[in-house]
Structures are given as C-alpha cells and as structure tokens.
Amino acid sequence: MTKRAEAKYKIDRRMGQNIWGRPKSPVNRREYGPGQHGQRRKGKLSDFGVQLRAKQKLKGYYANISERQFHAIYVEATRLKGDSGENLIGLLERRLDAVVYRAKFVSTMFAARQFINHGHIKVNGKRVNIPSYKVRVGDVIEVKEASKQLAFVLEASQLAERDVPDYIEVDHNKMTAKFARIPALSDVPFAVQMEPHLIVEFYSR
C-alpha cells in the first residue's frame, strides 16, 4: 500500500467513518481508530472536541489540507455574504483538486492533487498545476490530450460508487468538465455528514 493510501485510510480510522464512501475503507471491517490503543472505548467528547473533530474530518476529506490553508479558506468564507459555513463548503468545492475528483477524472481526492501537480489538467485551455487553484463559474476543466488514455483515468470515469454532482457538467468522452455553479452544502455528495457550522464555532471561540 502506498504512503498516500495509508494516510487516506488512517484518516478514516481516526474518524471512525468511511468519509469518502470507499469500498476498501478499513472502517468497513472495524470501527475503532488506528494504533494499538484504537480499540479502547472513547468517552463523550466536549463541545470543543466535537468542533475539532468536525474540522479534522472536513480537512481530511479534502486530502488533508494544511491548517494554514484551511484557516485561510475559513477567513475568506467569513468575509463573503451569507452563511459562513455554506461559504466554506462552496470555497472548498471550487478548489481545482475537488473539481477534478468530482468530475471522476481520478478515483480519490489524493490522486486529484497528484494528477494536477504532474501537469495533466488544463483550465480554459491553459495548463494549471496548482491543486488549490480557485475555479470560477463557467470555467472548463479538461484532461490534457496525452493523458486522456491513462488507464487509471479511464477506470475512474467508470466508478459506480459515486456520481458526478449536478453543479459540474461532465463529458467523459472528451474528458472535459464545466463548473456550472457554486454548490450549497446540501448539493455536495459527501458520504458522511459534514458540519461546517461546528467549524465556524471552533474558529469563533
């Protein structure tokens, strides 16, 4: 198993949830955390603990975004009009790695980050190799021509375990995707419940 896969599954075990809905997640077989003490019964979390856990889960979902990056996104969310929790989700879903994952060009959020880093993605005809690049409504994302026949790309597009959300318009024959609109929390196909309002409470302490 690769280090990336180990990190991904470690997040699942720590959260005690299959946060991406993956069939091979270890929590499908056991419901305790990683390490030798993972089987110990955990006590009830404090309000702070619940808020921290919500933050760790959302950060982990988006390929373990660094705290610095995540907090910067939160700050931006608070400066936008409307609900800060909803804004936070909208900004996270505008990340290029999130769009590439949602479009089913790759099978995992971690793979999306690597795929972009290696120069396989174009936005509006220009190569972009920054996973955190902020996609705008109307932007067209495409897999570079030379990369369209990569086996793992073709395999990802056929994954039955998740569907492409309706705020992304995808043509898998051409390997292109259009970011149609900024989603609300209820639009995003999370495999588990995400609670951005708890993250707002965490940072507001």
Swiss-Prot record:
Molecular function per GO: rRNA binding; structural constituent of ribosome
- Keywords, sorted A to Z: Ribonucleoprotein, Ribosomal protein, RNA-binding, rRNA-binding
PROSITE patterns documented for this protein: RIBOSOMAL_S4, S4
**UniProt KW RNA-binding keyword:** yes
A GO cellular component annotation in the UniProt record: small ribosomal subunit
Domain S4 RNA-binding, residue spans: 94-157
Checking SUPFAM superfamilies in the record gives: Alpha-L RNA-binding motif
Q: How is it modified after translation?
A: May be methylated on an undetermined residue.
For region Disordered, the annotated ranges are 19-45
| Matches recorded under Gene3D superfamilies | Ribosomal Protein S4 Delta 41, Chain A, domain 1 (1.10.1050.10), RNA-binding S4 domain (3.10.290.10)
| GO biological processes | ribosomal small subunit biogenesis; translation
Asked if rRNA-binding is a keyword of the record, the answer is yes
Q: Subunit arrangement?
A: Part of the 30S ribosomal subunit. Contacts protein S5. The interaction surface between S4 and S5 is involved in control of translational fidelity.
Could you tell me which HAMAP family the record lists for this protein? Ribosomal_uS4_B (MF_01306_B)
Sorted alphabetically, which PANTHER family does this protein's record hold?
30S 40S RIBOSOMAL PROTEIN (PTHR11831), SMALL RIBOSOMAL SUBUNIT PROTEIN US4M (PTHR11831:SF4)
NCBIfam families, sorted? PRK05327.1, rpsD_bact
The free-text function statement in the UniProt record for this protein reads: One of the primary rRNA binding proteins, it binds directly to 16S rRNA where it nucleates assembly of the body of the 30S subunit. With S5 and S12 plays an important role in translational accuracy.
What family is reported? Belongs to the universal ribosomal protein uS4 family.
Q: Can you say what this protein is called?
A: Small ribosomal subunit protein uS4
Look up and give the organism this protein is from: Rhodopseudomonas palustris (strain ATCC BAA-98 / CGA009)
